[in-house]
Amino acid sequence: MIYFISKKLEISAAHSLTLSYESKCSSLHGHNWQIELFFVGRELNQDGTVIDFTHVKKAVHGKMDHANLNEVFDFNPTAENIGRWLVDLFPECYKATVQESFGNTAVVVDEEKIRGIEHLVP
């Protein structure tokens, strides 16, 4: 069997972007980020889960919620870079959607984690 699960989170956090062009996003500003993480498992762990939802929330909220993301990360905190960080954070996570505001969403997929089962991915 293959198990697919997802976890939705809301994070309140601020950031400023370092960009090669003039933008108001270069100033410190905040968002209520909507994040959805997608996990895959070919087996369940000893507790009968792919990953514990509360562990996911604790790891992400503990690092990002009510934080200045420029002080948290050593990379430019774009939605795309945050998505990549989230996918890399959990071995079971193959996809992250990171919405910083309505209409502005990045989707990051780790193709290696779903190689061979792409046709099954919801």
Residue locations for each model-derived region?
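Charge-rich, low-complexity N-terminal segments
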Residues: M1-P122
